[in-house]
Amino acid sequence: MRTAALLAVPALMLAGCSKADRDAAGGEGEGVPVGATAEEYQAALGDMEPVELTYQVSASSAESSSGQREEAFADAVEEMSGGAITLDIVYGNAVVPPDEISSALADGRLDLAHWLTSYHADEMKAFTNLQDALVSVETSPLQGEIVSHFTAQEVAFNTPEIMEEFDAHGMTVLNPYNTFGSTALACTSEKGSPADFDGDQIRANAAAQSQQIDALGGSTVTLQLAETYEGLQRNVLQCTFGSPTSMVMSGWLETAGNVYMPKDSSFVSGPGSIVAGSSWDGLPLAAQQLIYDQIVAYNTGELGNAFVSAIAAAQASTESGGSGMHFLDSESEEALKAGNQRILDAVAESENLDGQQLLTDVEESAAKWADIAEELGYTDEGDYLDFADWYAGNGDVMDPEYVGPIVDRFY
């Protein structure tokens, strides 16, 4: 039964010799056992010529909060392999623009990449259904972030139609769904009811966000990420969707310091995926396994980045003279929930997969991860505006002592 398989993820997905077994079948040479040490990996890679893999990411620099997770991933790969595998991180999509990443992975200009999956809704229709299905997950600074993070990855890996879409692009998936944190709405003025959104031009970065904008009473604008800062400054835009990471990194909060999150549901996210291209099949099996195994470091940094960025966004939004980071008012929340229900109804009727099963999978996975988070002590003690006061982590992006227990449960 598919639901039973879902609840066992990623154990079933990664069963066998290593977490890499699912997609590493094409690799040559001997693999390593589960829990292999650095010494075992290095022995297995002893006959491999050192290799440098070009890894393009959207983070602006190594020093940025999102860049720190990339550096941690690369460092873990190099250390575990004894220098046999290194990742050359290219920041800011400097090799190719986002719409050329797929072809660059295919022709070898890139080996690994952060692919902006949400930009390809026409090609990734089942994936887009998952984006939309996740609006049913409740939002909160700590537990909600954890639940949405692992629910998205778990369901993506367990939905054959989604994995087939990556396969059709010649991609091997390392991390199917990452968002830089839950999606928020940053506005140039305070919003206390749906009437305050009336006539606002709101930038969307995912297809179904237009339905959420309609529900709130605004009008949808499509604008490139790089143009959003100026759009807010010139009042072409009154609000924009985005992750707290993007808001801080792009300076949007200087002008749009009134940030809103839903509570009983979610805004549609604009995620990306960590994928490998055509060169993957040329790596020895042990090398593939090693890279897969070190995605744990990436996930640790992804969660840490989400927490740190939420704190930074709350602080930056008040420092800019805005009202800070809040949950939507109750009337706007109800309007959004009505819009989200229309999104969920469309998922249920999807022609791309069994939409009703997808909704069930998301519901069950979210409940599972909420229970696990509760069990491990990840509970919300306040809201976004005072998150810095009650967050129990050390405030660093890479905080394995705090984030490690929940990441380890996934793997």
Residue ranges and their predicted role:
Residues 12-16:
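C-terminal motif of bacterial Sec signal peptides marking the signal peptidase cleavage site
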Residues 31-41, 106, 117-201, 205-216, ...:
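Contiguous mixed-secondary-structure segments that line small-molecule binding/active-site clefts
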Residues 47, 51-85, 167-238, 244, ...:
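Bilobed "Venus flytrap"/periplasmic-binding protein-like clamshell domains
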Residues 26-71, 92-96, 246-247:
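Extracytoplasmic "Venus flytrap"
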Residues 1-5:
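Bacterial N-terminal signal peptides that target proteins for export
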Residues 17-21:
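Bacterial signal peptide processing site
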Residues 219-326:
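Pocket-lining segment of extracytoplasmic ligand-binding domains
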Residues 67, 90-133, 184-188, 240-256:
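Pocket-flanking alpha-helical
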